[in-house]
Amino acid sequence: MSETLNLQIPSPTFEGSTGGWLRAAETEEKYAITWTSPKEQVFEMPTGGAAIMRKGENLLYLARKEQCLALGTQVKTSFKITDYKIYRIFPSGEVQYLHPKDGVFPEKVNPGRIGVGNVSHSIGKNLNPAQIKFTNKSFCD
C-alpha cells in the first residue's frame, strides 16, 4: 500500500453504530486506517462492537487518532498484519499521512532514527537497589 489514500477501498462489514462519533468528525476532521488482510476475519472495533474485515484491502473511518492506533495495535498483534497506515482527513478533503511517519513503526529502529532513553544493557544487568541505597551512587549512573 502506498502513502496516498484510495477512498474506493471497501470498508469492513459493521452492523452497529459509532455512537455519533463520526457526526462531529465530518465538521472537524476524521481519521482513516487502511490495512490488507489475507482473509475475512472478525475483529473488535475500538468504538465497541465487532466487525468483519474483508479479504484484501480495508478502509475504516474513525473520529480519533487514538482509535486508529488502538485498532492498528490490535491487527498487528492479533492478526499479524503489519501494513496498516493511518491518515487524517480534513473537511476540505485534504489528506495527511500520519503513521508510521518515516515508514518504520516507533518501536523499531532504522538507521536514521536516534534512540531516546535507551540503556545499553539488559534489565538483568540493572543494579540491585539494596546494594546502593546508602552510597552516593545513583540508579541512573
Curated annotation (Swiss-Prot):
Q: Does the keyword Membrane apply?
A: yes
Record-stated family: Belongs to the PsaD family.
SUPFAM superfamilies for the chain: Photosystem I subunit PsaD (SSF64234)
Summarizing the function annotation, the protein's role is:
PsaD can form complexes with ferredoxin and ferredoxin-oxidoreductase in photosystem I (PS I) reaction center.
Recorded superkingdom: Eukaryota
One GO biological-process annotation of the entry reads: photosynthesis
Q: Disulfide bonds, which pairs? A: none
Q: Does the keyword ATP-binding apply?
A: no
Where it sits in the cell: the answer is: Plastid, Chloroplast thylakoid membrane
Entry keyword set: Chloroplast, Membrane, Photosynthesis, Photosystem I, Plastid, Thylakoid
One GO CC annotation, please? photosystem I reaction center
Q: Which InterPro entries match?
A: PsaD, PsaD_sf
Q: What is this protein called?
A: Photosystem I reaction center subunit II
The protein's predominant localisation is plastid
* Membrane-protein topology: Peripheral membrane protein
Gene behind the chain: psaD
